[in-house]
Amino acid sequence: MPIITLPNGDQKSFDHPVSVMEVAQSIGPGLAKNTVAGRVNDRLVDACDLITEDSTLQIITPKDEEGLEIIRHSCAHLVGHAVKQLFPEAKMVIGPVIEEGFYYDIWMPCPFTLDDMAAIEERMKKLIDQDYDVIKKMTPRDEVIKVFTDRGEEYKLRLVEDMPEEKAMGLYYHQEYVDMCRGPHVPNTKFLKSFKLTKISGAYWRGDAKNEQLQRIYGTAWADKKQLAAYIKRIEEAENRDHRKIGKALDLFHMQEEAPGMVFWHANGWTIYQVLEQYMRKVQQDNGYQEIKTPQIVDFTLWEKSGHAANYAENMFTTHSESRNYAVKPMNCPCHVQVFNQGLKSYRDLPIRLAEFGSCHRNEPSGSLHGIMRVRGFTQDDAHIFCTKEQIGKEVADFIKLTLDVYKDFGFEEVQMKLSTRPEKRVGDDALWDLAEKSLADALDAAGLEWELQPGEGAFYGPKIEFSLKDCLGRVWQCGTIQCDFNLPVRLDASYVTEENERDQPVMLHRAILGSFERFIGILIEHYAGFMPPWLSPVQACVMNITDSQAEASEQVVAKLKENGLRAISDLRNEKIGFKIRERTLERIPYLLVLGDREVEEGTVNVRTRSGKNLGTMSVDAFIDLVKSAVAERGRYIVE
């Protein structure tokens, strides 16, 4: 009979097969009350599952990460229960857990409305109040088919067909409602009280737009009301920081139906874009990169030779001219190899670092487009380093330092790094992979950084390091990458002459710091809520007169600011100064300069910040020095 070993080493003996819940009850009623599931011999199981042999056991509660995932998964089933009660004609599809929540895909003859979502949420609450047990039954395959046939659940039957090897399946009963799942699930609906449905969207069966359209109901669930309230507050803050909303309010950009996934940059937004480009241009020049420019449209044969046509064709925009097929480039790497291939290269020439602000286009699904964060036309701060195997380590180490310095300039101090290593299917010999992986790991260690290993997650052509930023809301954005490539130089005949006067292929390092300009600007907008640091602000100063008699002097101040490289405007409207200050504050302009008769007479300006802090009266030269100092500090400078 089983001996159960607990995480603290204590052991409990039983003279009969025992369930996870029974073990919890033997430890104490408080633990049993909070038991969601168990981890038996490192495998998650339901609280009702029996343990028949000597085993290790961890009791899973809502405080555990796995417990929270189980709560969310069970909430998805609860959506199904409520939907079938309110809309019997609905056909249930799948309801998985996602980051911080869950969704359920449902076939309906007509779309759900927001009122429908509210009604579903209300019904879920009533079902939770009934405090019923969730019953698990392992059911033979034939009986599972009969259950879903009798209920007319055709999508569930299709899912059963996808699992021909399964002889028995777990059915979970929420009263009269039944769903199919590997589990585990909560033992009782009392664990599901802290949830909220968040939105409705469209989806397709199996994610294929050629298939029938489904309705997707999203929700979130947490261990308690406090966690739920904190999440809702964070989401509300994220909505207030939505780059699309701020982009419109600050006249930065717009999108329109005639060019889906393409950005119409307005003057203010384009100013931010240009600041980024000029900054990255200088950074790359200072670090030994040569800036190049390659064609937008390239004969399709190059993409066939590079391998992109075989693996990426559906995401490429193509065109035809004079009996030739072309593709609008979705990435820059094959073109950079063409530049490298011009002229004979020696080992003495390496490393060669080629950088391009490459404009790329990818035919992303329309449903995935999101403001300037997910677009079809974008520009990358793209570069490729051609080097010898022995140079990988130094190039990666230099890139890591450069990348972290750039992120600090934009105000991002917390950066996560992940090293992805060889997958099972790969090109290149093991010795080359050993060298590359060690070079990347050593570079991370030498920088004194914490990093996460992702075994088997590298591309088939080489290992990589990914850099992810954490913003002010704790959200993580993957931006930078450096990727070893042993494949493309071979496919595109890149070579150099070695010290032994032989031909060899260089290693190609794909690298980007910002990723795409469009997405990075979106991240900046949301991180700063539009209150950009002075160096990134489209307008750094607005000069305002109190009466018409100061208009000429105000224009002279603006002219001097511009002569000194500041981005400045004037507001000479015949409005009260308080009104003008309020309006320009809403535009998030860092500095507001006011001129009255006294300032004109003394040759000074009265300076206040967009947060309302009065910096007092100072000379124009002193103000110029103040702004230049703020700009020099970049993202480290906070306008009070």
From Swiss-Prot:
Its main location: cytoplasm. One of its GO terms (cellular component) is cytosol. Its EC number is 6.1.1.3. One of its GO terms (biological process) is threonyl-tRNA aminoacylation. It is found in: Cytoplasm. The keyword Ion transport does not apply. Residues 242-533 are annotated as: Catalytic. Keywords: Aminoacyl-tRNA synthetase, ATP-binding, Cytoplasm, Ligase, Metal-binding, Nucleotide-binding, Protein biosynthesis, RNA-binding, tRNA-binding, Zinc. This is Threonine--tRNA ligase. The gene is thrS.
